[in-house]
C-alpha cells in the first residue's frame, strides 16, 4: 500500500477535527432558568376575605339540589304571595268577591303570612349547604390550602360568614323585600303609598336579622364536627327537636320561651313589627325586643364557635399566618 503524498498529508492535517457530540446531562440535573419577581397586580391582605366570600357564592350557584332547589322554593312563595296581593287589588275581586275592607287586610297579611314559608326554604338551604361548609374544609384538609397562603383566621371567618349571608339572603331577604315593593306598587293612591311606605324598612330589618340567624347558626354547627353529615344532623336536631320543645313549653307556660326557636322568633318579630294580630300560629305572641335578642344571641353564638374552632386549627400548626 503506497504512502500518502505530501499534499494529501498536509490537507489531512489542515482539516478540522470532528466536534464531539453533546454530552448527556446527568440524571437529576436542575436547570436554573433564573428568578423573576412577580410584577402583576397584588391584592391587599385585608381584602382576602372577599375572595373567599365570592368563592362561596360561586360554589353554591354551581349546585342544583343544595342551593337552587331552595331558591326555587322561595321564588314560588314570592310568586304566590305576590299573585294574591295582585288579585286582591283587582276591582272584580275587591268589593264583589271579597269585601273591600277584608281584601285590604288580606293584602297586608300576605307578606307576614309568607314568612313561615321563607323560613322553611331557608332551613332547606341550611341543611343541604350551610351546615356542612366548614366541616367539609376540615375533613378535606382545606385549612392547609387557606393558611399556607397567609390567609388570616379572621379573613377565613369573615369570608365564610359573608359568603353564606349572601347565599341565604337570596332566599330569606330578597323575597320579603320583593313582596314589600309589590305592596307599595299596588297602592291605589299617593296617600295609601305614603301610609304603606314603612313596610319597606320593616321588611328589610326582618330579612337581615333572619338571614343572619340562618347563616351564622348552621355555619357554627358546621365548625363543631369535622364530619359534614354529623354536622348537618346536629343542626337538624337543634332546629327541629330543641326548637319544637321550646314551642311546646311556650304554649304550656304561656311565656316567651318560644323565642329559643329561631323560626318562632322570626314569626313573632314579623307579626309584631308589621302590627298583625296573630290569629293562629305557633304560640303566644313574641314581642320585638325578645325576638331580636334571641336572633342576635343565636348569631353571636354561631360566630363565636366558628372563630374559636378556626383559631384553634390555626394555632395547631396548620398554617403560618398571624
What are the language-model segments listed below?
Residues 21-43, 306:
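Short, contiguous pre-domain boundary segments
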Residues 45-47, 54-73:
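Membrane-interface helix starts
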Residues 110-136:
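Long, hydrophobic alpha-helical segments
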Residues 2-22, 87-92, 96-109, 229-322:
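Terminal transmembrane helical anchor/hairpin motif
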Residues 133-166:
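Helix-loop-helix units of permease transmembrane domains in multi-pass membrane transporters
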Residues 126-130, 174, 178, 216-217, ...:
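Hydrophobic/aromatic residues in alpha-helical transmembrane segments
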